[in-house]
Amino acid sequence: VTKGTSGEWRFWYDLNKGTLLAAALFVVMFVIYVSNHPAGFTPNVVQTASNKAILLAFVAMAQCLVVITAGIDLSAGMVLVLCNCLASWLVVGTPMQTAFGIVAVLVAGLACGTLNGLIIIFGRLQPIVTTIATSGIFFGLALLLRPTPGGSVNEALADVFTSKLFGIFPTSLVVLAATILLVWVPFSRSVYGRAAYAAGSAENAAYMSGMPLKRAKLTAYALAGLLSAMGGLYLTFYSYTGEAAFASGNAYTLYSIAAVVLGGVSLAGGKGSAVGAVFGALAFRTIGDLLFVFDLDPLWQPLFQGIVLMLAIGVGSIGLARVRNRLEWFQ
């Protein structure tokens, strides 16, 4: 291996260290889970775990897009809840009506994210304040749609999206991979994606260099709304119903922040990947599955989630401290 190649690998590793750590953590935890599951490593076990984890994975991807710009979206969970309630009204009937309903749900999520972006960028308000306010609006709309749990969904379509491809591989993971390829990869490699990273790492310098920061941020928030809507749509497919659950919306928001941190995304912005956020979400969700197979009280789940999160943050802090120590050598 040449010196240049070694340097490239080191650079790639430093850039993707958080993603690799989250992936390794998830693999270890999932192996422990399936090894101790009464049914073992079977397609049905993987399917059930995937269908539950994909909800948080979508919201974590949404959160990642915003966090990269040095923002935060505290309305992500409520967008999921709103779109779940909307889907329970619209994703029914004939194939044409169902298709229209899916498009309407995704457009609604896109509109929610765009609203957040417009207020933050042109209203010049802090993301945390803006998204707290809009989360209340989105939850209010969800309550108007579903004051009590109810509704339905096209069950044939729901079964397709929550079943197994060729009887082996979970369809939900195929949809998740397709979303990464169709949403995250084009965005991260586009001018807007590079500007989003620049906004999170050195916004003043990026502004002076003429990068399209406003459009990049608006795109990030809009896509975040779209991804949260996909989570809401999948929740409807999984539960066959809609519910304006305040606690559930808040939980998805908080867990999405934990997932991006676990996935190596810097809350200061400018660093991280949606792939890492997805692995962070999968690892975070697997904690609950581990409690199930070891027959532990679910009340222990927040404690174990907190421990795993603190360990992940600790590893990241050690790496950051090492970088700072090296920089001090040149001062």
Outline where the language-model segments fall:
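Cytosolic-side transmembrane-helix boundaries in multi-pass membrane proteins
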Residues: V1-V31, L181, M208, P212-R215, ...
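Structural signal for alpha-helical transmembrane segments and their membrane-water exit/capping regions
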Residues: L25-F41, T69, A142-P147, W184-V191, ...
